[in-house]
């Protein structure tokens, strides 16, 4: 039986990844600074620990022989957390420290294969000024100019892991995630992403009411459902391709149209009030030519399919909170 160590197992993607690995027959140790928000972890062992502490990283890697490490732990959140500038130092310090600690202890304990979750936020800001974005191929990451400290740290850590691959022979695989969403993700409190925030606003608002939206709503994104994200991760880890490679949808949608899609699921007719707020770039889409070439696969789910599943889940969360 293969053993996997999942860092960030108390988070959205990490929690789903643990379930996927267990379904494939892995023995899994999950690690996070917090428990999973919505259910107990299904990991064989779940360790509460702060990966900014090197002693914690040494302990979780040193007592067992792991076949694979999945490093998803990071200080992150939605636009309201990443783009205000108020958390820049924490994002840089916390995430960089986690990655420096984990890759060193993985090397010291002889973990042969590592997955690192990077982000589309590494791409240059000037390549994302047009809402009609035609996709961000991996090769345009340099010259580097991410639009946030979150993106800069991700780019640094890509290079960190690849340097350990070159110098120590670790089999490293890196994916650049593009706006992953789905059930069991944060949907309130300021760290939620756009799909969850939109679902919450619509679910909480009475018919004929009004929801608020940052900016003019013409900014565009692609959003990837969690099941397809995990399929991409597992295919990448089973391949001989290191990446970095995009794992994302190429179905571009404006935030205005995303809101209308969610309203359609709800059956409500709501007004949108546009207000000032952090926006990020104007247009971001995944270019999937490389993943198709290297893995013979690309995401295919229509956005509406995943969004309806997510809306129904968040609608249930809102209803349960109102009627405990």
Language-model-detected regions and their locations in the chain:
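N-terminal Rossmann NAD(P)H-binding glycine-rich loop of SDR-like oxidoreductase domains
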Residues: 4-24
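Conserved glycine-rich Rossmann-like NAD(P)H-binding loop of the short-chain dehydrogenase/reductase
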Residues: 26-35
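Rossmann-fold cofactor-recognition segment
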Residues: 42-53
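NAD(P)H-binding glycine-rich loop region in Rossmannoid oxidoreductase-like domains
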Residues: 51-95, 108, 125
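Conserved Rossmann-fold NAD(P)-dependent oxidoreductase catalytic core, especially the SDR/UDP-sugar
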Residues: 100-147
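NAD(P)-dependent short-chain dehydrogenase/reductase
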Residues: 126-135, 159-237, 250-252, 260-266
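Active-site helix of classical SDR
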Residues: 149, 153
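C-terminal substrate-binding subdomain of Rossmann-fold SDR/epimerase-dehydratase oxidoreductases
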Residues: 204-324
